[in-house]
Amino acid sequence: MRVIFSGGGTGGHIYPIMALIERLKEEGICQDDEILFVGTKKGLESKIVPAAGVNFKTIDIQGFDRKHLLNNVKTIQLFLKATKRAKEILADFQPDVVLGTGGYVSGAIVYEASKMKIPTMIHESNSVVGVANKFLGHYVDKICYTFDDAAKEFPEKKKLVKTGNPRSQQVLSLNAKPVDLAGDLGLNPKIPTVLVFGGSRGALAINRVMLKSLMELKKKPYQVIWATGTYYYDAIEKKLADVDYDDSIKVVPYIDNMPGLLPEMTCVVSRSGATSLAEFTALGVPVILIPSPNVTHNHQMKNAMDLEKAGAALVIAEDDLNENTFVSSIDHLLLDQSYDEKMRQASKALGVPDASDQVIKVMKEIAKKN
């Protein structure tokens, strides 16, 4: 089966595709030369995809600028060129299926594929549907989704298939080496441990509240792993030189082996991007979510609220984030074992351990109709 994948800009658009590619190869459904990822030169995908050894081509495209309307003249010009480039890629590669996960680049290639009568589908990882996926929903053959709230935004219900996020299955199948809390991090494996992190680059609001909470956290009967993010690590290290905190708080720039660490955690404090939530629910990890307000359509808050409604998370809005709400939320989770266990069960119930297989099943079905 020959497949073109497209998604751009953020990890939430890229990592589900990478999980699908891995599974397609594992099952012998696709060979390396039967898979193509179409993205942009500027997006995160331009680094991640080629580094993984996946065939990669680019389309030059940008989104509409709602503040500076004159900039949209260039946007329209780029879109017209993008559709021409998309046609060339499709004609050259001759895919059996084209799947998009979001981002303007996927809008161009998936739309053109649908016009050429090539089987098409999209996958929506968030609880709020992005602009590209909302547009493409009218043209594709199938729509895969993770959150029920997202399904409500698509008018053509016959196209909908609830599959979950492919990253869930990938995390469970990694067989990652468990992190040795004592040997690797100098922590006590016998006491509760909380991981605090804001993504690979870090989150300023989370780092600020951690700095303010250190003196209170050192008094607690649990320990903390604080992943500051690579962007903030050096500055925080300088500030910590004058702070009297003890060995129960381990400060690191980044977590290299997240699948190996998460099962060892009593709870996690995190942003609420779709990929992270797929990992948490797959493993049944209790979470305190601090959604980023700096995302389109406030989708991280909607993602987080869906988990909270299911009893799988506590949510702190960034506007409400302070030392008191932060520490008291951790206390509530770590010091009440019955609450912790209920949240683990609720989180695990939301996970989809065969999400990749479910998406691939849909891919095969629409490819047969070609």
Curated annotation (Swiss-Prot):
Enzyme kind, highest EC tier: transferase
Residues that span the membrane, as ranges: none
Record-listed E.C. numbers: 2.4.1.227
A single GO molecular function term of this UniProt record: undecaprenyldiphospho-muramoylpentapeptide beta-N-acetylglucosaminyltransferase activity
Annotated coiled-coil segments of the chain: none
Membrane topology: Peripheral membrane protein
UniProt GO BP: carbohydrate metabolic process; cell division; cell wall organization; lipid glycosylation; peptidoglycan biosynthetic process; regulation of cell shape
Pathway: Cell wall biogenesis; peptidoglycan biosynthesis
Subcellular location as annotated: Cell membrane
Entry GO terms, CC: plasma membrane
Residues that hold UDP-N-acetyl-alpha-D-glucosamine according to the record: 10-12, 126, 200, 255, 300
Catalytic activity reported: Mur2Ac(oyl-L-Ala-gamma-D-Glu-L-Lys-D-Ala-D-Ala)-di-trans,octa-cis-undecaprenyl diphosphate + UDP-N-acetyl-alpha-D-glucosamine = beta-D-GlcNAc-(1->4)-Mur2Ac(oyl-L-Ala-gamma-D-Glu-L-Lys-D-Ala-D-Ala)-di-trans,octa-cis-undecaprenyl diphosphate + UDP + H(+)
Task of the protein: Cell wall formation. Catalyzes the transfer of a GlcNAc subunit on undecaprenyl-pyrophosphoryl-MurNAc-pentapeptide (lipid intermediate I) to form undecaprenyl-pyrophosphoryl-MurNAc-(pentapeptide)GlcNAc (lipid intermediate II).
Family, per entry: Belongs to the glycosyltransferase 28 family. MurG subfamily.
Descriptive protein name: UDP-N-acetylglucosamine--N-acetylmuramyl-(pentapeptide) pyrophosphoryl-undecaprenol N-acetylglucosamine transferase
Gene: murG
